Amino acid sequence: MMAERFSALQAVAGPVSRETFDGLVAFEGEFRKWSARINLTAPSTLPHLWERHILDSAQLIRIAPAARRWLDLGSGGGFPGAVIAILMKEHAPAQVDLVESNRKKAAFLQTSLASLKAPCMIHPQRIEDCYGQIPPPEVITARALAPLPVLFGLAEPWMKAGARALLHKGRDYRREIEESRDAWGFNLLEHGNEVGGDGVILEISDLRRL
């Protein structure tokens, strides 16, 4: 079972040490424990937590293998930000900033990631309150947070400084792209989801208001 999980992780994220794999397994265990007390994710997805959330998050590393400064907006239960932070342990020096305004979820992230000594900082604030506090990252991530036009408005201050965004989107992503084009210009690359399903990962760069 563990060997299969390790192989699946390497298939989507590239070479990963056994220590990093063990860290992700430990995070999964903490996630399940805390989920019994607070709502970290939809209960229906818990039986498939490794594939549905952890591997789905880990695949971003393959798209931006050289990035060392990441910013995760609306981190929720830690996907993809916590997974990226754990993966970054073997790529020091690295920094992952996770922004989550829900205090209980932020407490979970702080406790679980501190115990794993992940190179990250948790910001228990609204995204808009973090402008000027978090230095420009190389990559911005967001998963199940908001439609593209809203995401662009939230990410704009960092993207103007040169960051690119890797955004998980579902089957309606083309409609969101078209709705964004009235107000925003941007470069777009579409990456297939290596874990399966109808979703994609949108790589956005050179974001600008029209």
Curated annotation (Swiss-Prot):
Select a single GO molecular function from the record's annotations and give it. Answer: rRNA (guanine-N7-)-methyltransferase activity
Which top EC class is named for this enzyme in its record?
Answer: transferase
Q: Which reaction does it catalyse?
A: guanosine(527) in 16S rRNA + S-adenosyl-L-methionine = N(7)-methylguanosine(527) in 16S rRNA + S-adenosyl-L-homocysteine
* Compartments, as annotated in UniProt: Cytoplasm
The UniProt annotation places S-adenosyl-L-methionine binding at 74, 79, 127-128, 143
The principal localisation class reads: cytoplasm
InterPro entries linked to this entry: rRNA_ssu_MeTfrase_G, SAM-dependent_MTases_sf
Tell me the disulfide pairings in this chain: none
**Keywords in alphabetical order:** Cytoplasm, Methyltransferase, rRNA processing, S-adenosyl-L-methionine, Transferase
State the EC number(s).
2.1.1.170
Q: Name one GO cellular component term.
A: cytosol
This chain's function reads: Specifically methylates the N7 position of guanine in position 527 of 16S rRNA.
Q: Which PANTHER family match?
A: S-ADENOSYL-L-METHIONINE-DEPENDENT METHYLTRANSFERASES SUPERFAMILY PROTEIN
| HAMAP family xref list | 16SrRNA_methyltr_G
The family line of this record is: Belongs to the methyltransferase superfamily. RNA methyltransferase RsmG family.
Q: What is this protein called?
A: Ribosomal RNA small subunit methyltransferase G
What is the species listed in this Swiss-Prot or TrEMBL entry?
A: Chelativorans sp. (strain BNC1)
